[in-house]
A protein has these predicted regions:
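Nuclease catalytic cores that cleave nucleic-acid phosphodiester bonds
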Residues: 122-261
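A short alpha-helix capping/helix-coil boundary motif
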Residues: 39-42, 109-113, 133-134, 190-192, ...
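Generic serine detector
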Residues: 21, 45, 68, 82, ...
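Noncatalytic, basic helical substrate-engagement surface that gates or grips nucleic-acid strands
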Residues: 2-10, 20-149, 153-157
Length: 329
């Protein structure tokens, strides 16, 4: 969900790709997949084929970014925040089981798997997340499982200058302290739609601490918010009273209600305690045999050969590597 009614207050700007190129980007994979799956084909294929459009989308992203001297880093969710509605564990377990069956059988026309995936967009998302994580590994793209929310560790990585932006349309990435967030990545058009934290602070006349207060007042993933308070009214209240607790007192919130708001607000402070030490963001050599096998599950032999050759060329051209390609083949 992100934060309620913030779409029109974020000063997103179209800028040239040079804003992040050459560089490294952290991709909030759950957010990215959710957006992609909403525009992908949603009706069952007549030939019974599994919904695997995410593979082409991811390979296209990898080719476009590497070709523009941008290293994509895939970030996936860990355990959800305690105040966030937890995902359906049975759904996740089923998606994981279906994916393992798919990897074992290598059959993109498996009727049982296909039927289950076409019935549930959420199931497809979890399946696709597993698939893309494995593809990233064999391609050589860094893949990280977050301690909690993907956008939280991604924001910490951007804060610590490990990456140049966080690719997500969830404003939580900004509130978690990322100084640069990209909503749309249009590499082929040589542009991105992004916001800088300092621009949002200036636009709203609130610093990061007060922006976090505002998010909780408006309603976010961790609290339903205060009734009747949107971003502009909330900003005025914070400017007038100084902070979340003071605003809650001013509007007559009881002690127990104030405590609940404060506990939700504390979630946004968690990135301050996250360490990015030891995170390795190098582009590794493609593991050609495993990549070839993975691609054979989803495309023709000619397409596999062409795709592998393109990825190898991109890897060779991206930068100097310590390992020789031969030891990986």
């Amino acid at each position: 969900m992100g934060v309620k009614n913030w779409n029109n207050v974020i000063p997103w700007r179209w800028v040239g790709l040079e804003d992040i190129s050459p560089g490294t980007i952290a991709i909030d994979l759950p957010n990215y997949l959710t957006r992609r799956l909403t525009v992908m084909k949603t009706t069952k294929s007549k030939d019974g084929r599994l919904p695997l459009a995410h593979v082409g989308a991811f390979l296209g992203l990898v080719r476009a970014t590497l070709n523009s001297h941008i290293l994509p880093v895939v970030i996936v969710d860990g355990p959800p925040e305690s105040r966030k509605r937890p995902p359906n564990p049975e759904l996740i377990q089923t998606a994981n089981r279906l994916y393992q069956e798919f990897v074992k059988d290598g059959d993109p026309y498996n009727e049982d798997i296909s039927e289950a995936l076409w019935k549930s967009r959420a199931m497809r998302m979890y399946f696709a997340t597993n698939h893309i994580k494995d593809l990233a590994c064999v391609i050589g793209i860094p893949s990280i499982t977050a301690p909690s929310e993907a956008e939280m560790i991604a924001a910490a990585m951007c804060r610590d200058n490990l990456v140049d932006t966080v690719v997500s349309n969830d404003v939580d990435a900004i509130l978690f302290g990322s100084p640069h967030v990209t909503k749309q990545l249009q590499v082929s058009n040589n542009r991105i739609l992004r916001v800088r934290l300092e621009e949002l602070e200036t636009h709203m006349q609130l610093d990061l601490e007060r922006l976090r207060d505002l998010a909780v007042l408006c309603g976010c993933d961790f609290h339903e918010g205060a009734k009747g308070i949107g971003p502009r009214k909330g900003a005025l209240l914070l400017q007038r009273h100084g902070g979340l607790l003071e605003v809650l007192k001013a509007i007559g919130a009881t002690h127990s209600i104030r405590e609940d708001f404060i506990r939700a607000r504390e979630v946004f402070d968690e990135p301050s305690y996250l360490s990015t030490d030891g995170i390795d963001l190098r582009l590794n050599p493609p593991i050609v045999p495993k990549l070839t096998r993975s691609l054979r599950m989803v495309m023709s032999e000619n397409a596999v050969q062409t795709t592998v050759e393109k990825i190898l060329r991109l890897w060779k051209g991206f930068g100097t590597q310590q390992s020789s390609l031969e030891q990986w083949i």
